[in-house]
Swiss-Prot record:
It comes from Mus musculus (Mouse). Residues 40-108 bind DNA. Residues 1-40, 101-287 are annotated as: Disordered. GO terms for biological process: positive regulation of regulatory T cell differentiation; positive regulation of transcription by RNA polymerase II; spinal cord development. Residues 174-187 have a biased composition (Basic and acidic residues). Transcription factor that binds to DNA at the consensus sequence 5'-ACCAAAG-3'. Acts as a transcriptional activator. Binds cooperatively with POU3F2/BRN2 or POU3F1/OCT6 to gene promoters, which enhances transcriptional activation. Involved in the differentiation of naive CD4-positive T-cells into peripherally induced regulatory T (pT reg) cells under inflammatory conditions. Binds to the promoter region of the FOXP3 gene and promotes its transcription, and might thereby contribute to pT reg cell differentiation in the spleen and lymph nodes during inflammation. One of its GO terms (molecular function) is DNA binding. This is Transcription factor SOX-12. GO terms for cellular component: nucleoplasm; protein-DNA complex.
Length: 314
């Protein structure tokens, strides 16, 4: 019957009428959706029913054409078809779906999972352990707190940790302290713990500064180096005019200033202003719009002998 339809179509010169084709012939077989491995295939849809015949035609015309290119052309042609032309193939796909359900009632679509390739093998590490040159090498340890903690054990011993904490607290609390030098006096921010160790150190002169520094040096931590002391001294010299001074130390600072030309000369402030040469107008000269009473009061004697003279009578 199918061959007769195809022969009639060839004689008429038109396309063969849509019929069941190979899909219907395969449906008559008992295992028409089973593969040799036992896998049950999905029922074909309308496009698959239509593309079976069209694919064969393209393969006959262009046998060297790639399968992907054939699929692209079939997809474009299917989209160009009108809905009325797709109706026969839609009906055939529905019939195949119902037959598939009758033959395989327990069928459930389970798409195959894409097999992931084996994970790439880890690169062999060079002998010697570690990550090679990617890891940073530990630098030389400075002789400071780290060295003291390492010598005391993994945690620096029992008394090393409290001692370090005390030193940190002393460095956080700062206090203004006067440093006396041979030709100059300046203010410096020093740790409060060091300033409180001896109040007598502030009263020492230039000669006692070296002795005070030598006496305080054993109590300082081992990690403080001379370079840090030089930097602190330089910083104190730069900011000597900006530091804030509190307490009684400013009074002592003024009392220890040597008298002389460098000191403050207050004698110029005690001079009588009447003895100064007149320069321009005085601040006691008022314009002409002053009242006679005000002019008389200004011209009169300010140093009255009694309070009664200052009372005005109108």
């Amino acid at each position: 019957m199918v061959q007769q339809r195809g022969a009639r179509a060839k004689r008429d010169g038109g396309p063969p009428p849509p019929g069941p084709g190979p899909a219907a012939e395969g449906a008559r077989e008992p295992g028409w959706c089973k593969t040799p491995s036992g896998h049950i295939k999905r029922p074909m849809n309308a496009f698959m029913v239509w593309s079976q015949h069209e694919r064969r035609k393209i393969m006959d015309q262009w046998p060297d054409m790639h399968n992907a290119e054939i699929s692209k052309r079939l997809g474009r042609r299917w989209q160009l078809l009108q809905d009325s032309e797709k109706i026969p193939f839609v009906r055939e796909a529905e019939r195949l779906r119902l037959k598939h359900m009758a033959d395989y009632p327990d069928y459930k679509y389970r798409p195959r999972k894409k097999s992931k390739g084996a994970p790439a093998k880890a690169r062999p590490r060079p002998p010697g352990g570690g990550g090679g040159g990617s890891r940073l090498k530990p630098g030389p340890q400075l002789p400071g707190r780290g060295g003291r903690r390492a010598s005391g054990g993994p945690l620096g011993g029992g008394a090393a940790a409290p001692e370090d904490d005390d030193e940190d607290e002393e460095e956080e609390l700062l206090e203004v302290r006067l440093l006396e030098t041979p030709g100059r006096e300046l203010w410096r921010m020093v740790p409060a713990g060091r300033a409180a160790r001896g109040p007598a150190e502030r009263a020492q002169g230039p000669s006692g500064e070296g002795a005070a520094a030598s006496a305080a040096s054993p109590t300082l931590s081992e990690d403080e180096e001379p370079e840090e002391e030089e930097e602190e001294a330089a910083t104190a010299e730069e900011g000597e005019e900006e530091t804030v001074v509190s307490g009684e130390e400013p009074l002592g600072f003024l009392s220890r200033m040597p008298p002389g030309p460098a000191g403050l000369d207050c004698s110029a402030l005690d001079r009588d202003p009447d003895l100064l040469p007149p320069s321009g107008t005085s601040h006691f000269e008022f314009p002409d719009y002053c009242t006679p009473e005000v002019t008389e009061m200004i011209a009169g004697d300010w140093r009255s002998s009694s309070i009664a003279d200052l009372v005005f009578t109108y």
